[in-house]
Structures are given as structure tokens and as C-alpha cells.
Amino acid sequence: MLLAGAIFVLTIVLVIWQPKGLGIGWSATLGAVLALVTGVVHPGDIPVVWNIVWNATAAFIAVIIISLLLDESGFFEWAALHVSRWGNGRGRLLFTWIVLLGAAVAALFANDGAALILTPIVIAMLLALGFSKGTTLAFVMAAGFIADTASLPLIVSNLVNIVSADFFGLGFREYASVMVPVDIAAIVATLVMLHLYFRKDIPQNYDMALLKSPAEAIKDPATFKTGWVVLLLLLVGFFVLEPLGIPVSAIAAVGALILFVVAKRGHAINTGKVLRGAPWQIVIFSLGMYLVVYGLRNAGLTEYLSGVLNVLADNGLWAATLGTGFLTAFLSSIMNNMPTVLVGALSIDGSTASGVIKEAMVYANVIGCDLGPKITPIGSLATLLWLHVLSQKNMTISWGYYFRTGIIMTLPVLFVTLAALALRLSFTL
């Protein structure tokens, strides 16, 4: 256990610290090699882990490529400028619409896309409106927060969701039927908390005349228009084709290919830059990181956690839901959500829970790993990258400020979301 734990801690430190620009993929690979050399994992574990991660990572990359292409076409700026007009010059209404836009983008383009793509657009828009630094910080924090709390509804909304759905064989429709209503509760709770926390920083009014026309944001009309068609086809494909056995990654890849071909023909978008910007290292990161996590499983960590989950399961649906969700949220906040979701999945699989209790634990694990990272900056790689993007925009958020805000905001939203899950699953009893 000590050796497996030491390798895991070393890997996490390298992934978060990234000394001398060392990519997350190579850090995870180093951890995996150490685990193999020391016998913590065995060569036979490699195909097992690959079977867990391949569909998730491929789907995630395809969705991010679609997001990047649409961003280059002006799609997201166009949407942001439209919702800013729906605010009708009222600050609180603008704040609400920006949060709801972030929720929609997170649902369709994954949490990473929502946080990293929307943030620079929101900053530019707020600067154009002449908002203060405090107001800009409030809007930026809101955009970053909703990106994770609203990344629950669809399998493709978060890499965590895809990994868990693949592990437990959850279909797209089955997953959405449970998590869409839960996500609505999460969005409402997030909106309430954001308005309460940042109430002093949201301006009463703003001058809509300072905003440019949404049409001016469109840089590649062909890619912009095709994007709407691709989104519709993706949603239909996910709900219709995935139940027939076609992987989510294959459906997403076709959508990315169609959009890429259109963008390539238009010459307005640097498609080479888009491909270089795709998170290719996530492939070797997922395989390497999960091999290291599998070492923890081989060393008995997940067996210990299974015992904890058994106690929760014995106390009924609500205890299982709330207990699992808060446990995995805490683990995500201190050891990153990507390894945590697999630790949680392996522990649930090894527990004696069955029926609706096990189902509750599976979804609570997803919720904990989606929302838990908002407590600390190290909870997710997307948050670390988001903070880096902000620093490049001369907006530095200290880890202390992030933690204070994160823990106050996250715990109530997490509780409401888990309670919504327990209520939703109560109807299946």
C-alpha cells in the first residue's frame, strides 16, 4: 500500500506542478512505468485500463476539437453577445444569463470547453462595458464555477461522466434520464449561491450601446452555420445510435470531422492551430494515471473504501447518496477528480451494494467528482489551466481566495444536487 501510495502522490505532484513544462501525459507515464517496474501493477492490467479509458478520452478530444472550431468561427462570442442583450441593461439579469450560457456550453461542449473558451470572451465583453475589477472577477468566477456544477446532464458533459458511464455500462438515454433533472437542481442552486455571494459586486445597470453587434463576432459563416447542424446531429446520434452499440467517441468523431472539413475549406480558420490546441496528452495521461490508480486498487485501497461504502449502503438510499457524493468530492479536492472517479468506481464495484442503492452510488460518485474540484484549485486540471489563462489576462486569483470561495459555494450546491439525485431515484423504488 505504501509503495503504491508513494507512486500515486509523486505522479499527482508532477501532474499539478508540471516542472519545466513537463506535460501531464509524460508525468502520468512516468508514474505508470514506476508502477510496472515495481510490480504495483502488472502488464495484464494495461488492456483492462485501456478498455476503461479509450472511449472516454477519444470522445473528450472530439468534443474539444468541435468546441475549438466553433470558438474560432465566432460561435461562442456570438452567443455571449446575444445573451448580454437579453440582460436588457440590468446587471443581475446579465449575470444570470451569463451563468445560464455557461451551463448550456458545459452540457454540450464539456466543462473544460465552457471554462476555457467562455472566460476570455466574458472578460473582453466586461472590459468593453467598463466594469470594475471586482465585477469582472465576480462574472469570471461565476463562469468558472458553473462550468463544473452544470457538467452533469449528458455523458459527454465531463470526462468524468464518460469514464463512469463506460465503467458501469450506462447508456446515453439512461444516464440523461437520471441526471438532466439533477443538473437543473444544480444550476438553480448554483445561481442562488452565486447571486448571494457576489451580490455586492454585480452592478445595477450597464450600457448596452457599448456592446458590438453579435453578427460582427462571426468570422467563418460556413463553420458557424454547420456548427448548428453538427450539434443537432450529435444529440440525435447520441440518443439514437449509442443504444445500438456505436461508441459515443465514434459519433463525436464524425461530428468533429464534418466541422473540420468545412473549416478547412473556408480558409478563415487555422485548422492546424486547432489540432495543435487539442488535448492529445489526455490520451497517455488517462492510460498512465489510471494504471497508477489501478495500483492503489491492487494494494487494497479500493477494498477499504468498499467497506466504507457498505456501511453507507446499509443505511439506505439517502445515506448512500450523500455519503458517497461527499466522500468522492473530498477525495477529488485533494487528489484530483480524474483518479478519484476510477477509485470511486472500483470501490462501488467491489462493494455489496445492489439495485437502486448501487445506482445512487454510481451517480453520486459522478456528482462528487464533477463538483468536488471546485473546492480547491488542484481538484481538476481544467481549473489549473483556467487559472493560468486568467493570469495571462492580468487577473490573478490566489489559491487562498479560490479555496475560501470554493468551499462556501460548493458545499451547499453539492448537498442540493445530491438531495435531488436521491429524490429522483426515490421514484424508481
Swiss-Prot record:
- Chain ranges passing through the membrane: 21-41, 46-66, 98-118, 121-141, 152-172, 178-198, 228-248, 249-269, 274-294, 311-331, 407-427
Please name the Pfam families in this protein's record: ArsB
Q: Return the GO cellular component terms, semicolon-separated.
A: plasma membrane
Cytoplasmic-facing ranges: 1-20, 67-97, 142-151, 199-227, 270-273, 332-406
Question: InterPro entries recorded for this chain?
Answer: Arsenical_pump_ArsB
Q: How does it sit in the membrane?
A: Multi-pass membrane protein
Q: Which domain of life is it from?
A: Bacteria
List localization entries.
Cell inner membrane
Instruction: Report any one BP term from Gene Ontology.
Output: antimonite transmembrane transport
Keyword vocabulary terms for this entry: Arsenical resistance, Cell inner membrane, Cell membrane, Membrane, Transmembrane, Transmembrane helix, Transport
Enumerate the Periplasmic topological stretches. 42-45, 119-120, 173-177, 295-310, 428-429
Instruction: Report the GO molecular function annotations.
Output: antimonite secondary active transmembrane transporter activity; arsenite secondary active transmembrane transporter activity
User: What protein family is recorded?
Assistant: Belongs to the ArsB family.
Q: Which PANTHER family match?
A: TRANSPORTER ARSB-RELATED
Please explain the role this protein plays, according to its UniProt record: Involved in arsenical resistance. Thought to form the channel of an arsenite pump.
Name-wise, this protein is Arsenical pump membrane protein
